[in-house]
């Protein structure tokens, strides 16, 4: 078979799953994929690689490549490498990202750009898949187009000059030189989807509705409203293209427990883990606020954990105990929850390079695995739905699961699974005849990820302490009936601190006394650039509505101590644009901000209240932070463009961060007198110079 090298760089398992799908399909198309994690540099060598390269790369943090790609990126970023270092290399790259974030698919773009700078050329156009609208909209056609591109490459490599472009929309020359063009693939690929002929694909199963659902042919449909469990024409009568069945590879044996003690320390982590006590918890909002915001103080005095303002850290959290018990009960495993789970690879598996899941510790209990290791709230991927089909006995339920994982059912999958935040438990309750084995769940459920939080303190101000702030997340899951769920981590933390929670709406500068009993496990996050400038004379602008204010409290505490230590120092202006709903309900850190303002640490404080109506004949105040930024556009432009200032934005990526970005574009356009495109280029330059920094989340 014709061999190609297949590398993946994954953070939460998405890129790995897609690479494994490519690997499985390769055999059907007459290719052999040499599959490796990009971190396994001892198993491949790009310097001497002669086969074509396919790379699947996700994005994490603020546009960073995954942790698994850290070493690889560092090596290829070596500026001493010659420009023809990879001139022999031909590759195709699929980037994964979320367009709700500013640095969309940036992990893939970083690698893609650097490979080309070192002489590598495309044999297939780069794809950018968007998790905001559904990765499959790009992933599926990109994979479908990979096979003709590989065939074309192998034909041309026999004596002809390599051709770098594979899709009909691109010319070979432009795909080598025009990086911007590749960013349009996530739109173009939806057009390409119409060009690929799926009728002859061996890796799909075409199912006729009459054959699969013949027992329902005489049923009169009275309610034409579709749902998770029911479809309507034309989908209910369509022939379906469904994915190939993922090969099973785990063999599970349950053994009675020997009674050994388990703890969250057993949870696997690439970074060091510290168990630290909670020394204080304070409610920052009133009881009638729309969201409940808590401040938690951790005692890190007996650890080697260190941080600086602007850093983030991860909290290792468990799944909800009630959800774990409900899932075990539905799987008819509740009487075996304390049994040890022994895993090994099936001797006859067809999965290439199958390995045991690294996030499941050896010999731990079933209860521990479902509580600490598996993301049971994860939205099931189509491959998981396809696997569940074969363990569903009811023909109507089987057909519906087939529809949801099919190409024809993409809209229903988005509406009833992805957008409804459906999880495995929702599906199992909605499809009662589905009885999957434990091994299947361990194969498909991803690792329970630690949750990141911004440090909301300075170690100069609070020695031996670490503060963080969070809203208790609540959301409606609408998969079957409406269910109000709390965030996995914030719901757990709220329960954990309930007995020690101080109901004050303002956090105190004073320590509350002895460390309290509850402990949590935390780990440091990789270093980022969301830090105060090294030169304290540089003016800064901070934009942080809601809990986005967290890192800026650390900035201000740090600056206060620096000014105490250097009373004659030259310190730049500090602007803060803060926003909340109501002045009297959720004005976080009100007392602290007044303190910083009074003592000249904070030079300008601009607060927006989005839900407070004007009183009497008052003019309507700035409703959101971006409105306040616009009101002070002249000063903002002066700081950024004339005084070499920095701007930091922290908070919601979906709306706020984009609105702030748009406001900055308008300000620069107006104050400098340039077109919006030129203003956008100016902001892009600020980002490159690390003077426009973001710490945002969805």
Curated annotation (Swiss-Prot):
FMN binds at residues 93-124. GO terms for cellular component: cytosol; intermediate filament cytoskeleton; nucleoplasm. Changing residue 22 to M: May increase risk for spina bifida. Residues 5-147 form the Flavodoxin-like domain. Keywords: Amino-acid biosynthesis, Cytoplasm, Disease variant, FAD, Flavoprotein, FMN, Methionine biosynthesis, NADP, Oxidoreductase, Phosphoprotein, S-adenosyl-L-methionine. GO terms for molecular function: [methionine synthase] reductase (NADPH) activity; FAD binding; flavin adenine dinucleotide binding; FMN binding; molecular carrier activity; NADPH binding; NADPH-hemoprotein reductase activity; oxidoreductase activity, acting on metal ions, NAD or NADP as acceptor. Disulfide bonds: none annotated. The keyword NADP applies. It comes from the Eukaryota. FAD binds at residues 451-454, 487-490, 697. Its cofactor is FAD; FMN. GO terms for biological process: cobalamin metabolic process; folic acid metabolic process; homocysteine catabolic process; homocysteine metabolic process; methionine biosynthetic process; S-adenosylmethionine cycle. It holds the Pfam family Flavodoxin_1. It is linked to Homocystinuria-megaloblastic anemia, cblE type: An autosomal recessive inborn error of metabolism resulting from defects in the cobalamin-dependent pathway that converts homocysteine to methionine. It causes delayed psychomotor development, megaloblastic anemia, homocystinuria, and hypomethioninemia. Cells from patients with HMAE fail to incorporate methyltetrahydrofolate into methionine in whole cells, but cell extracts show normal methionine synthase activity in the presence of a reducing agent. It is debated whether the reduction of free aquacob(II)alamin occurs spontaneously or is enzyme catalyzed. This is Methionine synthase reductase. It comes from Homo sapiens (Human).
């Amino acid at each position: 078979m014709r061999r190609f090298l297949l590398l993946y760089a994954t953070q939460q398992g998405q890129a790995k799953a897609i690479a494994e799908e490519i690997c499985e399909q390769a055999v059907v198309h007459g290719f052999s994929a040499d599959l490796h994690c990009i971190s396994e540099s001892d198993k491949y060598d790009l310097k001497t690689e002669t086969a074509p390269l396919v790379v699947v790369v996700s994005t994490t943090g603020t546009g960073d490549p995954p942790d698994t790609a850290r070493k690889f990126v560092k090596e290829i970023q070596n500026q001493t490498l010659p420009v023809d270092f990879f001139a022999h290399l031909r590759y195709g790259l699929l980037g994964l990202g979320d367009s709700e974030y500013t640095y969309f698919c940036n992990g893939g773009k970083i690698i893609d750009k650097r490979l080309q700078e070192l002489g590598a050329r495309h044999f297939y156009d780069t794809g950018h898949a968007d998790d905001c609208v559904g990765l499959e909209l790009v992933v599926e056609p990109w994979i479908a187009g990979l096979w003709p591109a590989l065939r074309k490459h192998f034909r041309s490599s026999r004596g002809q000059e390599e051709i770098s472009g594979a899709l009909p929309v691109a010319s070979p020359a432009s795909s080598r030189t025009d990086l911007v063009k590749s960013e349009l693939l996530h739109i173009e690929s939806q057009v390409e989807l119409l060009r690929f002929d799926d009728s002859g694909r061996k890796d799909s199963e075409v199912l006729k509705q009459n054959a699969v659902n013949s027992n329902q042919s005489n049923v009169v449909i009275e309610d034409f409203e579709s749902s998770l469990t029911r479809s309507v024409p034309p989908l209910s009568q369509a022939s379906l293209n469904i994915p190939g069945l993922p090969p099973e590879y785990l063999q599970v044996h349950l053994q009675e427990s020997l009674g050994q003690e388990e703890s969250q320390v057993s949870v696997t982590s690439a970074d060091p883990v510290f168990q630290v006590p909670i020394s204080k918890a304070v409610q920052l909002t009133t009881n009638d606020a729309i969201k409940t915001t808590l401040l938690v103080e951790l005692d890190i005095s007996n650890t080697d954990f260190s941080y600086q303002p602007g850093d983030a850290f991860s909290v290792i959290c468990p799944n909800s105990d009630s959800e774990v018990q409900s899932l075990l009960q539905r799987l008819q495993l509740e009487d075996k929850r304390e049994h040890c789970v022994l895993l090994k690879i099936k001797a006859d598996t067809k999965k290439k390079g199958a390995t045991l899941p690294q996030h499941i510790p050896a010999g731990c209990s079933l209860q521990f695995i479902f509580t600490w290791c598996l993301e049971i709230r994860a939205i099931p991927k189509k491959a998981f739905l396809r696997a569940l089909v074969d363990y569903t006995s009811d023909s109507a339920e089987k057909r519906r699961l087939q529809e949801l994982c099919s190409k024809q059912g993409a809209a229903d999958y988005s509406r009833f699974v992805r957008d409804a935040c459906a999880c495995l438990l929702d599906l199992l309750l909605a499809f009662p005849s589905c009885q999957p084995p434990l091994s299947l769940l361990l194969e498909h459920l991803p690792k329970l990820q630690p949750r990141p939080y911004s440090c909301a303190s300075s170690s100069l101000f609070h020695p031996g302490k670490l503060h963080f702030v969070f809203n208790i997340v609540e959301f409606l899951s609408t998969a079957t009936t409406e269910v109000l769920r709390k965030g996995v981590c914030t719901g757990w933390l709220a329960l954990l601190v309930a007995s020690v929670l101080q109901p004050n709406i303002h956090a105190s500068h004073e320590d509350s006394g002895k460390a309290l009993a509850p402990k949590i496990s935390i780990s440091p996050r990789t270093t980022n650039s969301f830090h105060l400038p090294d030169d304290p004379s540089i003016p800064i602008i901070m934009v942080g509505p809601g809990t986005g204010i967290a890192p800026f409290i650390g900035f201000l505490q740090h600056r206060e101590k620096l000014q105490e230590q250097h009373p004659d120092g030259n310190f730049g202006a500090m602007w803060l644009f803060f926003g909340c709903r109501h002045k009297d309900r959720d004005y976080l850190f009100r007392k602290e901000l007044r303190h910083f303002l009074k003592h000249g640490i904070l030079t300008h404080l601009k607060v927006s209240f989005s839900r407070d109506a004007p009183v009497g004949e008052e003019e309507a105040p700035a409703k959101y932070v971006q409105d306040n930024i616009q009101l002070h556009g002249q000063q903002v432009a002066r700081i950024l463009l004339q005084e070499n200032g920095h701007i930091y934005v922290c908070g919601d990526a979906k709306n706020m961060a984009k609105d702030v970005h748009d406001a900055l574009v308008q300000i620069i356009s107006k104050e400098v007198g340039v077109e919006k495109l030129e203003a956008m280029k100016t902001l892009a330059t600020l980002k490159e110079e690390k003077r426009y920094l973001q710490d945002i989340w969805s």
